[in-house]
Amino acid sequence: MRKLKVYLDTSVISHLQQEDVPEKMHETQELWRQLKERPDVDIIISDLVIREISKCSEPKLSFLLGELAQIDYKIVQVTEEERGLADIYLKNGVLKEKSLDDLTHIAIATLNECRYIVSWNFKHFVNPKTIKAVNAINLSLNLSHVDIFPPSMMLGGF
């Protein structure tokens, strides 16, 4: 049986310890607990996620790395193909150039055939305009459809 692939963006991992938004932090921690118990799910993160997380200060950085060590995940390296797809998203107006890293996350998830992207980034990821535009481009390029949800919508089953 083929495993379900789920891409976690930086905001999800960062919210494992985010005291200023306790509701999001608790929902993220619950999703993390559920992911630990799902051998049927391939968790995908990218080297871009690792680079972004590494900008956190201590002790948060050590905490997040410790949490990552508790789950089974695959790190994928950003490729030229993914950068190219991010540029296509950019040229088609999905987001502005200052959000190129966000488009790169979406491209990574798409080209690694992730069914879901999980993110707390409502401005750039988890909004109907972005999702619709990304999937229209993906369809035109014969790429897979991707759903983008916050952790709260992933709780209880996916």
Annotate each predicted stretch with a short phrase:
Residues 63-67, 74-77, 148-150:
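Extended, non-globular alpha-helical segments
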Residues 10, 47, 120-122:
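Short secondary-structure boundary segments
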Residues 73-131, 155:
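Active-site neighborhoods of divalent-metal-dependent phosphate/nucleic-acid chemistry enzymes
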Residues 2, 19-20, 26, 112-158:
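Acidic, PIN/NYN-like endoribonuclease modules and their adjacent C-terminal/linker elements
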Residues 1-45, 54-66, 91-97, 131-134, ...:
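Short, well-structured N-terminal submotif of metal-dependent ribonuclease cores
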Residues 37-39, 69, 139-142:
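Short, structurally constrained coil/turn elements
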